[in-house]
From Swiss-Prot:
Keywords: Hydrolase, Manganese, Metal-binding, Methylation, Protein phosphatase. The keyword Transmembrane does not apply. This is Serine/threonine-protein phosphatase PP2A-1 catalytic subunit. Mn(2+) 2 binds at D145, N177, H227, H301. The lineage of its organism: Eukaryota, Fungi, Dikarya, Ascomycota, Saccharomycotina. Residues 1-57, 348-369 are annotated as: Disordered.
Length: 369
């Protein structure tokens, strides 16, 4: 299993991956000098976009007007065309009034299809929905990392948020470590918003919205789903329910760990090479599953070449849903279907052909960061 060595921004780590495919848009645009004047300390302050200034006291109730608007946005986005800045503002305000009422541990019923990292690979996201079935016919659970690295983070996160608002009980979007103000400044989403909108306003809206994403989900009280992994400060799922998630991802602590940690072959807790979170061994995952009467921990956060990988004697599964990650890693992607009887099936798929790009077979990566 390969570790995607994202690190907290305070460590001053720059992007480690050099794209080898020719694109009109560079992955990170390499335009920090031009963008420097656009950024200020205020950009890191939660709530600066104003999307949550007038939160509702009850969940959003869809009416015909809302439904028609959402359907138009989804149709527009399905063509890989970004929404206008005004429409992003409207969408994010609606999404706040859905997400703020979801729990830290979102209960999910079976059947459900569980998905890993997407990372701005919009055409591959559409392929995912072809493989797994359209929403709302299929009940989906996404485990975070919708933005950064890929070329279409704006369209990807807009599409998933629009689907969430349109079908709030048929799609769940958890927070990943990349749904963060600090990480998105380093790995592409911030620059993409500047490039496509000419300002940081859309970036502010979405990063404010990320604070409201639930951080874990529990499928039929048996499968614990989250982006990263376990925390030495969390022994029970009830402790996750008590966390204050409406904030920027902290640099340390239990919320940070849930979004950053990784399983490891070594037992116990270890220092993570990422600089945030921990590594945890089979003894830790077995004890957590036993304490909480779980059958499985499902998580994302790491590239796995076949799209999924078991660890810790099948106490943990990693799911990765971005094929040919960063358009060069040569991996397959996968999603995991869980049926009414808790039977699990993995559906693997290769990258979708992007418009204007020739079809190429998967290749072995030269290296991985």
């Amino acid at each position: 299993m390969d570790t995607d060595l994202d690190v907290p921004m305070q460590d001053a780590v720059t992007e480690q991956l050099t794209p080898t495919v020719s694109e009109d848009m560079d992955l990170n645009n390499n335009s920090s000098d031009n963008n420097a004047e656009e950024f200020s300390v205020d950009d890191l302050k939660p709530g600066s976009s104003g999307i949550a200034d007038h939160k509702s006291s009850k969940p959003l109730e869809l009416n015909n007007t809302n439904i028609n608007q959402l359907d138009q946005w989804i149709e527009h986005l399905s063509k890989c065309e970004p929404l206008s800045e005004d429409d992003v503002a409207r969408l994010c305000k609606m999404a706040v009034d859905v997400l703020q009422f979801e729990e830290n541990v979102k209960p999910i019923n079976v059947p459900v299809t569980i998905c890993g990292d997407v990372h701005g690979q919009f055409h591959d996201l559409l392929e995912l929905f072809k493989i797994g079935g359209p929403c709302p016919d299929t009940n989906y659970l996404f485990m975070g990392d919708y933005v950064d690295r890929g070329y279409y983070s704006v369209e990807t996160v807009s599409y998933l948020v629009a689907m969430k608002v349109r079908y709030p009980h048929r799609i769940t979007i958890l927070r990943g470590n990349h749904e963060s103000r600090q990480i998105t400044q380093v790995y592409g989403f911030y620059d993409e918003c500047l490039r496509k909108y000419g300002s940081a306003n859309v970036w502010k809206m979405f990063t404010d919205l990320f604070d409201y994403f639930p951080i874990t989900a529990l499928v039929d009280n048996k499968i614990f789903c989250l982006h990263g992994g376990l925390s030495p400060m969390i022994e029970t799922i009830d402790q996750v329910r008590e966390l204050n998630r409406i904030q920027e991802v902290p640099h340390e602590g239990p919320m940070c760990d849930l979004l950053w940690s990784d399983p490891d072959d070594r037992g116990g807790w270890g220092i993570s090479p990422r600089g945030a979170g921990f590594t945890f061994g089979q003894d830790v995952s077995e004890q957590f599953n036993h304490t909480n009467d779980l059958s499985l921990i499902a998580r994302a956060h790491q590239l796995v070449m076949e799209g999924y990988a078991w660890s810790h004697q099948q106490n943990v599964v990693t799911i990765f849903s971005a094929p040919n990650y960063c358009y060069r890693c040569g991996n397959q992607a996968a999603i995991m279907e869980v049926d009414e009887n808790h039977n699990r099936q993995f559906l693997q798929y290769d990258p979708s052909v992007r418009p204007g790009e020739p079809s190429v077979s998967r290749k072995t990566p030269d290296y991985f960061l």
